[in-house]
């Protein structure tokens, strides 16, 4: 049963990532604008900004 639930969760994660299209920031409505709060260094911020991990803001 655990394997089944894990498989379903994995499918949802893959669909979510494919749906937001993290590799094409121009088509990504989920990207974070400059100055907004971010969590991970490489994901989330609109290009050309990156997440400043010291301040947790896109810059």
Curated annotation (Swiss-Prot):
Disulfide bonds listed in the record: 31-46, 38-51, 45-58
A GO molecular function held by the record: calcium channel regulator activity
Signal peptide boundaries: 1-19
Cellular component, GO, one term: extracellular region
Main location (coarse class): secreted
Location relative to the cell: Secreted
Parts forming coiled coils: none
Tissue/organ expression: Expressed by the venom gland.
KW Signal (keyword) present: yes
Keyword set, alphabetical order: Calcium channel impairing toxin, Disulfide bond, Ion channel impairing toxin, Knottin, Neurotoxin, Secreted, Signal, Toxin, Voltage-gated calcium channel impairing toxin
Superkingdom in the source lineage: Eukaryota
Note on domains (UniProt): The presence of a 'disulfide through disulfide knot' structurally defines this protein as a knottin.
Family from the record: Belongs to the venom Ptu1-like knottin family.
Function field: Binds reversibly and blocks P/Q-type voltage-gated calcium channels (Cav).
Name assigned to this protein: U-reduvitoxin-Pr6a
């Amino acid at each position: 049963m655990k394997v089944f639930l894990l498989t379903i969760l994995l499918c949802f994660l893959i669909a979510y990532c494919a749906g937001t299209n993290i590799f094409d920031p121009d088509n990504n409505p989920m990207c974070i604008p400059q100055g907004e709060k971010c969590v991970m260094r490489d994901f989330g911020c609109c290009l050309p900004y990156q997440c400043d991990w010291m301040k947790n803001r896109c810059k």
